[in-house]
Each structure stands twice: as structure tokens, then as C-alpha cells.
């Protein structure tokens, strides 16, 4: 299985979503052969096209070009990624738990939408319908956002400040994530030295503050 994307300045979103279904599929810069297994996503002046071909069978989907973003439309990148995702979800029977999310922090999105005045129903629609996020993952993200909210509000009061502490180790990689740094299985030996240094740094910051 190969991934071929054409017609976009960047095919990152399409490539990332295809790998939710075919994790080892390489990206190719040349059109696949006629009988070659592939996912082919394309933007042309006529519209958006997505095709999957595997084991002698194939399926495809088409959509018109989206309206400009300033008129309420989606970006061509997201529209083509979404079209390809829908095709592959039907083709494989797989539903990724985080849906179409790529390179975003879901909890941060909830905070941003609430700060922008969105209703809870609008946020529900944004996650469950636009991104096809599973109910279980969305409810988890909402629970974390609800837990964080009073703490974040206190951080905006006079005489307080927020301190971001980075923990660059993950036991696994979330499907939406594009910035995981250290895999726990591979880099476990670095965890304790990192935490020891982090504790010393936090102590020093407390003394300065």
C-alpha cells in the first residue's frame, strides 16, 4: 500500500489520516501503477478525489471544491483529508478513536471554543460530527477540561502566574499527535534523571518567584 497525494501545497493531514488505517504505508512522489495497492488523494480544478485500491478491488469518492474559509468553508487540505478518511473508514471498517484530529490537543480546543463563546452543543457537534471523534474519547477530553478550568481561572488573577512543565515521555502515541518526543519503551532510562533535574528546576523557580 502506497500513499500518493497531489494538488496540495502540503499533504500532511491526508498522509497522517491515511496512516491511521495503514500505519506502514510509505508516501510516494510518483503515481502508482495501475494494479498497485494505493491510497490516491487529489485536488484538481474540478474538485476533490480520493481512491483506495487493494487486492484487485477499489473504491473512490468525489466532492466539489470547498467554499473559501472566509465564507465559512473548510481548507482544501482538511476537505481532502476528510474525504479520504470517510472513504477509508468505510473501506476498512476501522473507526479511529480520535477521528480526523491531527496535530492538535483536544483539551486545548475545548478551552479555546468555550473562551470564544461556543455553546456546549456547538462544541459537541465540532468534535463528534466534524472530527468524528468517539464519544468515549470526547467525554474524557471534556472531563479533563472541566477539571482544568477552575485552575486556569485562578492563574489569571493578580499575583499569580502559570508555569508550563513539559514531560517529554509518552507510554504510547495518541493517533492525533504529531509532536511526540520520547517513547517510554525506548527511552525509559532517561526518565528518572529528567525528573530529578525537573524537580531541581522547579525548586529554583519557586525561590526566584
Q: Over which residues does each language-model region extend?
A:
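Short, charged N-terminal beta->alpha structural module
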Residues: 1-26, 134
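Short, well-ordered secondary-structure micro-motifs within conserved domains or adaptor modules
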Residues: 18, 24-81
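Accessory, often N-terminal, substrate/partner-engagement and coupling regions
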Residues: 74-95
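N-terminal [4Fe-4S]-dependent radical SAM core
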Residues: 88-95, 115-163
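Canonical Radical SAM [4Fe-4S] cluster-binding loop centered on the CxxxCxxC motif
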Residues: 160-193
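Conserved SAM/AdoMet-binding glycine-rich loop
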Residues: 199-209
